[in-house]
């Protein structure tokens, strides 16, 4: 196979492997839920089904994760707790994985330590509007240079808009000297060693590039609105919000 046929063959194999993993997870979760039911533990158990991120399956021409587009940025979250959450209820508020620990402490009647980020999700369980809940989220990917060669970028997401800034110096060594300690037996070890052996240097240029998306109108994020007529006010507001996050989180540019 060559050309398009080879690409399609690789993609189909990739999808099949991915779906097999999903089926395995589904089966294992089902076994766990069955055990809880059989031992009458379901009503007194908090079940959280989530992930560390979403995943690309060809969207935007990508696989894997890392970029701030919705397919990776938007993560699954299902919580079952019969004592406090009505079955089939939904919540559209913005939450983060850093909210999990405060939530578990809150449900256990324990106070969140001052140093711990995040907010308890318990106020959202009733399905009622919650005052003073967050209206935006911040994202930052900074692991460049690395063998993924995904450029540094950060951004903010509100209910309607998303601003992404790709930034940083290019032309750097993909595997800086002594940055990585290769662990024998790991799947990534061969890649680090290979890049070191060929003294790999990226040909990426310096970058300072914005992307702006209207999530309501363009949920697939296919049309970059940055610099388009009529978007100046939104750009200004989103840039201001990004600057606030960077300052509060002490982000190095």
Predicted regions span which residues?
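Short beta-strand segments
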Residues: 46-51, 78-79, 136-142, 164-165
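Beta-strand elements within well-structured catalytic alpha/beta cores of enzymes
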Residues: 18, 22-25, 29, 46-51, ...
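C-terminal, low-complexity/hydrophilic appendages and adjacent surface loops
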Residues: 70-73, 143-227
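Polar, surface-exposed loop/tail segments
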Residues: 42-45, 87-156, 231-241, 253
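Histidine-centered active-site microenvironments of extracellular/periplasmic hydrolases
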Residues: 34-87, 96, 117
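Active-site rim elements
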Residues: 7-20, 64, 84-95, 107-112, ...
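Long, internal low-complexity/basic segments
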Residues: 1-13, 21, 25, 193-211, ...
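A long, amphipathic alpha-helix that forms part
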Residues: 3-45, 107
């Amino acid at each position: 196979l060559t050309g398009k046929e080879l690409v399609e063959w690789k993609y189909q194999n990739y999808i099949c492997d991915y779906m097999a993993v999903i089926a395995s997870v589904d089966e294992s979760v089902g076994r766990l839920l069955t055990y809880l039911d059989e031992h009458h533990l379901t009503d007194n158990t908090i079940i959280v089904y989530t992930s560390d991120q979403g995943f690309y399956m060809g969207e935007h021409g990508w696989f894997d994760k890392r970029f701030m587009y919705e397919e990776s940025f938007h993560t699954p979250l299902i919580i079952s707790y019969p004592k406090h959450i009505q079955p089939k209820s939904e919540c559209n508020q913005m939450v983060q994985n850093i909210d999990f620990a405060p939530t578990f402490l809150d449900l256990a009647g324990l106070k969140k330590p001052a140093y711990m980020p995040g907010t308890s999700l318990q106020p959202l369980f009733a399905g009622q509007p919650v005052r003073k809940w967050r209206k935006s989220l911040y994202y930052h990917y900074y692991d460049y240079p690395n063998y993924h060669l995904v450029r540094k970028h950060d951004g903010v997401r509100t209910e309607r808009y998303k601003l992404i800034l790709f930034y940083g110096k290019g032309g750097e060594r993909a595997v800086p000297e002594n940055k990585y300690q290769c662990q024998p037996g790991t799947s990534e070890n061969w890649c680090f060693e290979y890049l070191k052996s060929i003294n790999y240097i990226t040909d990426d240029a310096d970058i300072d590039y914005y992307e702006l998306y209207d999530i309501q109108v363009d949920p697939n994020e296919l049309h970059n609105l940055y610099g388009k007529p009529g978007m100046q006010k939104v750009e200004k507001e989103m840039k201001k919000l990004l600057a606030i996050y960077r300052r509060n989180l002490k982000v190095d540019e």
